Amino acid sequence: MATSPYPLVAPEIAGSPSRPRIVAALSGGVDSSTVAAILHEQGYAVEGVTLWLMRGKGQCCTDGLVDAAAICEQLGIPHHIVDSRELFQANIVDYLVAGYADGITPLPCSQCNKLVKFGPLLTYARETLGISQIATGHYARVRFNSELGRYQLLRAVDRQKDQSYFLYDLSQEHLAHSLFPLGNYTKAQTRQIAARYGLVTANKPESQDLCLIETYGSMRNFLDQHLGQRPGEIVDTQGRVLGSHQGIHHYTVGQRKGLGIASSRPLYVVRIDAAMNRVVVGEREEATQAEAWVRQVNWVSTPAPDEPLAVEVQVRYRTPAVPATLIPESPERVKLQFAEPQFGVTPGQAAVWYHGDLLLGGGILERPSP
């Protein structure tokens, strides 16, 4: 094994007598590039794989393909491009458009990780390349709990960059064959490592959280292109008409800015009524709720509980986790009772619950009852 100044990635694999083979998922960004470089230096037989998701400019598209190829050439490793455009269209683009048209705010990144990236990437690695292990640039950690006989997902050391929230829907099969080498590093350390290797992506700007924004300029542009204008009413919680809108897909629960209505007090989106093509607004308290139902639950790190469970729950990527009691109705549906009422709990987004750094599970927030 080659000498490396960085901790061994999966030493149980690295300690094998022959060079262990691994696929590095390369987006063309600094994070995935650094992963490939670390693994290569530590003696892994690395092969880069880039998923071609969309046409157009952006890290996830043409520019990403070019930069990923440049990294592989720099490291002297093979590079493979997998045409995943149809898969991305069906599972992400169509999913987003349908969700916004239905008045919810979908979370495409967790869907993409499960259905477009990890599953298909593992299949390609095994069936085409004969490789059973993949590594990605996600900021998260995985460990094996021998008592439970399960792989477990944990937050990254760098809480500001932690991406475990987007990985809650992965399976045991995914975790068993995936490595996250950056989980123990901060973003600043990653850039330092990339600079040490002299990677061509070392100074590449940070990408958008949502790759579609890089292609379309904004989520509004993306939705307007696919849904057009669909005028309707903006009403208060009593049904009084306050103004008009050009499409419910321009709004999300908790939104205050850009409502386009005059009011003597701050108003927020309380709910979106797709059937009536209405946006319902109210005062902040009316956009606050003490509990929420969650469907399509995935218990990634632990078995589903039979009894209520004290957790810390995160209902948006950029919001802190808050104390809550989780009450299971079934393994696939739970109720969350927040210790304090929460503002802007948005249908379609993910609720993800933790014990400290350990991600227990998550699911999709349902619409509250009217």
From Swiss-Prot:
GO molecular function terms listed in the Swiss-Prot or TrEMBL record: ATP binding; tRNA binding; tRNA-uridine 2-sulfurtransferase activity
Catalytic reactions on record: S-sulfanyl-L-cysteinyl-[protein] + uridine(34) in tRNA + AH2 + ATP = 2-thiouridine(34) in tRNA + L-cysteinyl-[protein] + A + AMP + diphosphate + H(+)
Active-site residues, as the UniProt record annotates them: 112 (nucleophile), 211 (cysteine persulfide intermediate)
CDD domains hit by this protein: MnmA_TRMU-like (cd01998)
InterPro entries: MnmA-like, MnmA-like_C, MnmA-like_central, MnmA-like_central_sf, Rossmann-like_a/b/a_fold
Cellular location(s): Cytoplasm
Keyword rRNA-binding: no
Any one GO BP annotation for this protein: tRNA wobble position uridine thiolation
NCBIfam families xref list: PRK00143.1, trmU
Name the record gives this protein: tRNA-specific 2-thiouridylase MnmA
